[in-house]
Structures are given as structure tokens and as C-alpha cells.
């Protein structure tokens, strides 16, 4: 491991210390909560910063694993139009990532979904078995 990889691993561990990034792939439906900072100017001329969170839910159509510059592309349909947004995986702007549904696909990049609409754009759901515990048996 060279010095750049070591430096990247240190930064990734610092950025993920207070948040958990789940394992997800292309085809999974995720809900990404993003931190948005609004600037407003008050009557007395002072600048006021307000922080809020916004959820963005859609299908992951591409994932790019490149160390600290890793990102993923999420596509959703909003008011009949397809909207895509790329999120940096380790960005401090990304507050949380939740996997809503796991999908079954046979490709790493799902760019073909851009030309599809309706039923042909659906992705089958992959069911993850729940670990059997003593409480589940009782």
C-alpha cells in the first residue's frame, strides 16, 4: 500500500466514524438523506444559515468504487420525468444512506433504464433471509 492509499484510508475512516454506509449494489432502491444549508439575509443585513435534511429515494443505476472519491448514481421519476443525481459516498453532505429494497439485476451499470418506462423499468426484488436466532424459533 503506497502513501496515497494509506492517506485515503485514514480519511475514509474519519468520515465514516459517525455514520454507517450499508452495502448496496446497482438495482437496489436507496433513500439518501442529504444535508442542505440555506442562506438567508435578515432585515438587519446579517446572514443567517439554516440547516435542513432532504430525502432522495430512487434506484441505484451505477456505483463507482474509487477510494475516497467513490460515488453512486441514483435515478428516480419525479412528476413523470426521470431525475438522476450522483452522490459522493463519503461526502459530509450525505447524512445517511438507507437501503429500502434489494433488487435482482444482471448488470453493474443500469443505464438502459433511461430508455425504459412503466413496467419495463421495474426491477425484481431480492429477498434477503433473516438470520435465525433463538428468539425467532420460540
Swiss-Prot record:
Output the superkingdom of the source species.
Bacteria
This protein's UniProt keywords: Ribonucleoprotein, Ribosomal protein
Asked whether the UniProt record includes Ribosomal protein among its keywords, one would answer yes
One Gene Ontology term of the biological-process aspect is:
translation
Q: Any one cellular component term from GO for this entry?
A: cytosolic large ribosomal subunit
**Which GO-annotated molecular functions does the record name?**
structural constituent of ribosome
- InterPro entries, sorted: Ribosomal_bL19, Ribosomal_bL19_CS, Ribosomal_bL19_sf, Translation_prot_SH3-like_sf
What family name appears in the similarity comment? Belongs to the bacterial ribosomal protein bL19 family.
Quote the function comment for this protein: This protein is located at the 30S-50S ribosomal subunit interface and may play a role in the structure and function of the aminoacyl-tRNA binding site.
Output this protein's name: Large ribosomal subunit protein bL19
Amino acid at each position: 500500500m503506497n502513501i496515497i492509499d494509506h492517506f485515503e484510508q485514514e480519511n475514509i475512516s474519519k468520515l465514516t466514524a459517525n455514520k454507517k454506509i450499508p452495502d448496496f449494489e446497482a438495482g437496489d432502491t436507496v433513500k439518501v438523506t442529504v444535508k442542505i444549508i440555506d442562506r438567508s439575509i435578515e432585515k438587519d443585513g446579517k446572514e443567517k444559515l439554516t440547516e435542513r435534511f432532504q430525502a432522495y429515494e430512487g434506484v441505484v443505476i451505477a456505483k463507482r468504487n474509487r477510494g475516497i472519491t467513490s460515488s453512486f448514481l441514483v435515478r428516480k421519476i419525479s412528476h413523470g420525468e426521470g431525475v438522476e443525481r450522483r452522490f459522493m459516498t463519503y461526502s459530509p453532505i450525505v447524512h445517511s444512506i438507507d437501503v429500502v429494497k434489494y433488487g435482482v439485476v444482471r448488470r453493474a451499470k443500469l443505464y438502459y433504464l433511461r430508455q425504459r418506462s412503466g413496467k419495463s423499468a421495474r426491477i425484481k426484488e431480492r429477498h434477503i433471509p433473516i438470520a435465525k436466532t433463538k428468539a425467532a424459533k420460540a
